[in-house]
Structures are given as C-alpha cells and as structure tokens.
C-alpha cells in the first residue's frame, strides 16, 4: 500500500489556519475585514483574556441567508471573486475563502446572521471544524461571530501565545488601524472590564486622528496629499489581431497618497507608529517603509522613526495582494515608481508644512552678514591649492565656511523642509516636554521688555513677534556670547536661543557641499605628500564602488597596492587624522546596507561626513562677528533645525516660557 495519503478537510483546515491565524489579533483581523466588506457602518469587538477565552465581532452589515451562511465554512467558498481574472481587479479586503473554515477548525465558533430584508436569522455552531447545530434565530440585520477557546484542540499552538496583556495590545492596535482607515464607520473595542476604544463616525480623517490620539499628536502631524499617473508600459493588452476597431489602450490610472506625517520634532524609537494602507488594506511593506525613511533622511536621526498615517490608492492591477494568506504582504508592478513617488511626496509635504514666503521675504530684506568676512575663492574641479602655501592658509582659516553663492540656483538633491524649531527636547524618541522653569538667568535681563519689578502685569510687557520658531526668526537672532565655547547664546523677539555651534556649522557645510557639487565648483587642496591609507578588504571593495563619487567631492585617490590607497588631494579643511577618519567612516557607513544603496544615499553620506569633520568644533572660541555670520548662514539653509545626522541644532525658550519662569503670567 502506498505511503501518500490525502488529508481530511479538518486537518487541511488546521494546517491552513497556521498561516491565516497565529494569534487572537489574526482572528479579529479576518472578521473585521469581513464586516467591512459586508458594508457595515458599526462594528463592535469584544475580547476576554486577550482573546483566548472569547472574541466577539458584531456588525450591522448586509448579513447572509441560511444557504450562504452554511456554505461560508467550506474551504475556498467566497462571494468576492468568480474567476482567476477577478484576481487582477480585487477591490474587497477578503477573497480567498480560507478565514472562516480555518478559524472554525481551531475554536468553538458560533455565528448568528440575518440578511437585510429577511424575517429570521440563522445560528450556526461549529467546534473543531465539525458543524454541531444549524437553526433559525431572531437577530437584527448583520452578523455576529463568537469565538471561544481559541486553539483549544491545538495545544502546541496555544502555548506560543503571549501574556494576555500582550495579546490584547495586538488586538487594540489592529482595531485602531482599521478605525483610522475607515473614519466613516463606528468602531468599538471592549475588554472584559472596560471600553478600550469608542470611535463614532466622522467626516474627516483628521477628526479620527483627534479621536484616537488626541489634540497634542494631531498638532504634531502634517497633512499630505499627492498624485501622479502610472506608466503605461507593461499593462496587459490583447494582441493586435484580437483588437476591434474601437479598441483603446487601457488607462494606467493614478497613484495617489494622502494622510499625515509627523513633524521632525515628533520621533519614535520603532516603526509601530507607521500605519500603511493600500486601497484601504492594512499592509506591512519594506519598500514603503524604506521610502518613508528616505523621506526623512538627514532630518531625523537614523535610529529614530516618524509617525505616519498613509493611505495609498492605485488601480488593482498595479498591486498583487494574493501573495500570502494573511494578505498583509503585497507586490507592486512599478515598485520603483511607488518608492520614489512616496519619498518625494513626504519631502514636499515637509517643505510645505509652513508657507515659504516668510522665510524668503526675510532673506531678501536682510543684508548678508557674510559680506564682511573673508571667504575662500571658488575653484573649478581642475584647480587645486597646494597644501602649506600662503593661499592655502587663508583658505583653511575659513575652510568650507563661505556662504552659498547667490548665483547657484540649482535646487538641492533633496526637498527643502521648513520646520518649526522645537522647544527643549531629546534627540530621539518622543519629544519630552520642556522644563517648566528654564534657567535663563543673566540673559533674561537683555530680553526685550524685561523688568526687575514685580508690579508690572502681563499687559505691560511688549508682545513678542510670535510664539512659534520660524526660519525667518533665525535671521533675526542677536548673539550674546558662548557657553563653554561650545554653544552660542542668542536672543530675538521670540525668546532665548541656545545653538550648538558644531552641528549648526555642519548643516551649513552639508548643504553648501551639495550645492557646489551640483554645479561642479568643488574646493580641493593638493597634499604636499600623498597620504597612504591602509584599508580592510571589504573597504577596498567599497572604495572601488564609490571612487568616482569621492572624486566629485574633492578627493583625488587611487589604489596603491592590494590593500592601500594613496590620497593626493582632499576637500579644503580636511587634513591628516581628520581626513583618515572621514574616509574610513564613509567606507564603513556606505557598506552597511543589506541592499545596494542608491547614488543619492552615497552622496549625502559623503557630504555629511565631510561636513561633520570640517565643521567648527566644540571648545572653539568665536568672536561676535563669526557668531553673527554662522547664525545668518544657518537661516539660509533648508533644514535649520537638525544636522545631517538628525541631531537638534537649536533649543528655544519662548517669550511665554520666560514670562512663566519669572511668574509674569
């Protein structure tokens, strides 16, 4: 007798359940999607013991008649598709017909449903995949699923469940996801003791965000919306001999995105606050996560993550949702188009977070402070300055520190983001609240409107120009001095500022390097003696890959043996040990990705490393003229609130904070 056997339907369903249902949240997901597909406007979810003992999902959708209700528990029975061609135009959340039989095979299930227009409903009870009871039942229109004792007949699966609180948190996160995606529906989530979520229907997504996260989070979010047409190439078309005279090529459709992204000041330690929906379907996709990360590159630290709520809409033929039974993994026909579109849309939204007119007007109205400072003369790529010469000494005094030349009109290879300067906060994670009474003794006496007397009321204090820090406000800063020769103390009508001189100069140099490179006006100096640098094997491989990009940034280097390179010229301001450290850092950083990095990423990393090693260091005294110049140049940058590595540049104590500290208000 043969060794191969055909598995029973019950065993097959339990195996399928391993892919579809791995925890209580998976059950909730499948039942929620069924309710949404059934056009429900109110969905109630109840759980006990984290979903182990009880999961109940009740909706007021279209319901089912008895025959359909019984057939729904057969494998691959569905009302969503009829043929394989329908897979190309799936518009519903469910379509595989696997969820209900899989859930019924590993739990004790009861379903009560009544179709719209029917007088009576149907009650079906199933345990371990065996139908126990089917009878008429009185019920309101809609469907109610009650799942008890999940994994009761598969103890090996049950023991892998986490603590009740952990499982409940997964269920809560899932319901929150769908409540955000469908603001027109009423969602409720209840545990055995209290209500966890009650979100009535609203008209706008922003109202739903307010319901779930509150006003504080909503104020830290930036709305975004963008669209672009898809490329026609690759669309399925019939052969010429099968086309009729009235044949028209298929419309490729549009790619659209709308939603919210967080301001740079709001940062998280993981990706749990990134919500992604494609055609209202919850997905977790690496490509989209990478595009979001790229959109925030050089704006927040690489170890921090933004908050994002993104709804992507595209024609069904552009996305394949039939990749995994859980339907959270998808594939895109034009993945590179989607990635670049989403990355650029995020950057543009950050740029438009506030009107740019105020910043541009401030720049045009202010006289550049840099006109009174010595500057290095720009040279073409072919020109070099011998190290050690008198000219090199003059250039090194302000190496890479001259302002961006007004004649350079080309945009930076990344979008300009205009952001409010954050108040006192950490560099990563959720921004903590500023201290209630910042220590500003000494500087407070020079704040406009300051008064030592306590008899003056708030109405006697001149109002500041505005509470929110803006790009224009940086140009109006007046330096007071330095704190330990590392931080610039400055004031304007908005309040008191502390600026990290190193990261501020780093931001100025970073954007200047990118601009100069775009027009091939790189400053370089030739070394009197070539600098020999020994590299590890993987570093030599990486050097060969980015040698051309290094040359565009002012380096002249070539292999000198199997594990050595000879550096003959370098960007102005980089010499000796700093030059060695910078090159090793670039070779290590650009080689840590799991995939081949794009050219723009390599360029920005090289520019960021050059800027970091060339910038003014801490513990460096600056005269008032140099401080004024640095603040003016910082105001000209696209992202004056963070360095290329995401560290904050400035902390602002607003006028209101200062008044509150001295009990004026």
From Swiss-Prot:
Keyword tags: DNA damage, DNA repair
GO CC terms in record: mismatch repair complex
Gene Ontology MF annotations: ATP binding; ATP hydrolysis activity; ATP-dependent DNA damage sensor activity; mismatched DNA binding
GO biological processes: mismatch repair
Annotated InterPro entries: DNA_mismatch_repair_CS, DNA_mismatch_repair_MutL, DNA_mismatch_S5_2-like, HATPase_C_sf, MutL/Mlh/PMS, MutL/Mlh/Pms-like, MutL_C, MutL_C_dimsub
Highest taxon of source: Bacteria
Function: This protein is involved in the repair of mismatches in DNA. It is required for dam-dependent methyl-directed DNA mismatch repair. May act as a 'molecular matchmaker', a protein that promotes the formation of a stable complex between two or more DNA-binding proteins in an ATP-dependent manner without itself being part of a final effector complex.
Family: Belongs to the DNA mismatch repair MutL/HexB family.
Name under which the protein is recorded: DNA mismatch repair protein MutL
Organism, scientific name: Acidobacterium capsulatum (strain ATCC 51196 / DSM 11244 / BCRC 80197 / JCM 7670 / NBRC 15755 / NCIMB 13165 / 161)
């Amino acid at each position: 007798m043969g060794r191969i056997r055909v598995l029973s339907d019950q065993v097959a369903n339990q195996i399928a359940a391993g892919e579809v249902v791995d925890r209580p949240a998976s059950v909730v997901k499948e039942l929620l999607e069924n309710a949404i597909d059934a056009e429900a406007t109110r969905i109630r979810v109840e759980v006990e013991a984290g979903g182990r003992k009880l999961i109940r999902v009740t909706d007021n959708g279209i319901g089912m008649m008895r025959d359909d209700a019984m057939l729904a528990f057969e494998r691959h029975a569905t009302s969503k598709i009829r043929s394989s061609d329908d897979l190309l135009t799936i518009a519903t959340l469910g379509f595989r017909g696997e969820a209900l039989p899989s859930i019924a095979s590993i739990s004790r299930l009861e379903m009560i449903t009544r179709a719209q227009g029917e007088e009576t409903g149907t009650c079906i009870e199933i345990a371990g995949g065996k139908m126990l009871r089917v009878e008429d039942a009185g019920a309101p229109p809609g469907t109610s699923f009650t799942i008890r004792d999940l994994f009761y007949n598969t103890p090996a699966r049950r023991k892998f469940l986490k603590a009740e609180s952990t499982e409940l948190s997964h269920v809560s996160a899932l319901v929150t996801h769908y409540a955000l995606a469908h603001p027109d529906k009423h969602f409720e989530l209840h545990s055995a003791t209290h209500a966890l979520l009650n979100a009535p229907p609203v008209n706008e997504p922003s109202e739903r965000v307010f319901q779930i996260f509150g006003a504080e989070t909503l104020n830290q979010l930036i709305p975004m919306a963008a669209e672009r047409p898809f490329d026609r190439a690759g669309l399925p078309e019939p052969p010429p001999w099968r086309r009729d005279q009235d044949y028209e090529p298929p419309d490729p459709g549009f790619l659209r995105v709308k939603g919210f992204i967080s301001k740079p000041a709001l940062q998280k330690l993981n990706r749990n606050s990134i919500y992604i929906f494609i055609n209202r379907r919850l997905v977790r996709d690496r490509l989209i996560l990478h595009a979001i990360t790229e959109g925030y590159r050089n704006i927040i630290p690489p170890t921090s993550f933004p908050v994002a709520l993104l709804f992507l809409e595209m024609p069904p033929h552009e996305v394949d949702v039939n990749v995994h039974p859980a339907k959270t993994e998808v594939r895109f026909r034009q993945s590179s188009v989607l990635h670049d579109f989403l990355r650029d849309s995020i950057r543009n939204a950050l740029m438009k977070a506030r009107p740019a007119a105020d910043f541009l007007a401030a720049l045009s109205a202010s006289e550049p402070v840099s006109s009174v400072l010595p500057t290095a003369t720009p040279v073409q790529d072919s020109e070099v300055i011998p190290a050690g010469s008198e000219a090199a000494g003059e250039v090194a005094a302000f190496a890479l520190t001259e302002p961006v030349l007004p004649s350079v009109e080309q945009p930076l290879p990344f979008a300009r983001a205009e952001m409010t300067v954050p108040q006192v906060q950490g560099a990563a994670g959720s921004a903590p609240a500023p201290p209630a009474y910042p220590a500003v003794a000494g500087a407070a006496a020079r704040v406009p409107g300051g008064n030592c007397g306590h008899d003056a009321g708030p109405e006697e204090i001149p109002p500041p120009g505005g509470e929110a820090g803006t790009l224009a406000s940086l140009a109006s800063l007046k330096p007071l001095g330095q704190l330990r020769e590392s931080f610039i103390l400055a004031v304007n009508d908005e309040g008191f500022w502390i600026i990290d001189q190193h990261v501020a100069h780093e931001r100025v140099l970073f954007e200047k390097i990118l601009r100069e490179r775009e027009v091939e006006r790189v400053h370089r100096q030739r070394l009197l003696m070539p600098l020999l640098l020994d590299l590890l094997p993987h570093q030599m491989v990486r050097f060969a890959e980015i040698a051309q990009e290094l040359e565009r940034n002012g380096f002249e280097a070539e292999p000198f043996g199997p594990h050595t390179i000879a550096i003959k010229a370098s960007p102005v301001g980089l010499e000796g040990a700093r030059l060695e450290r910078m090159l090793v850092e670039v070779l290590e950083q650009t080689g840590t990705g799991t995939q081949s990095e794009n050219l723009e990423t390599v360029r920005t990393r090289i520019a960021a490393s050059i800027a970091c090693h060339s910038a003014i260091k801490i513990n460096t005294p600056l005269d008032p003229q140099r401080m004024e110049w640095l603040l003016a140049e910082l105001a000209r940058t696209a992202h004056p609130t963070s360095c290329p590595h995401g560290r904050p540049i400035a902390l602002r104590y607003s006028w209101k904070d200062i008044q509150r500290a001295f009990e004026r208000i």
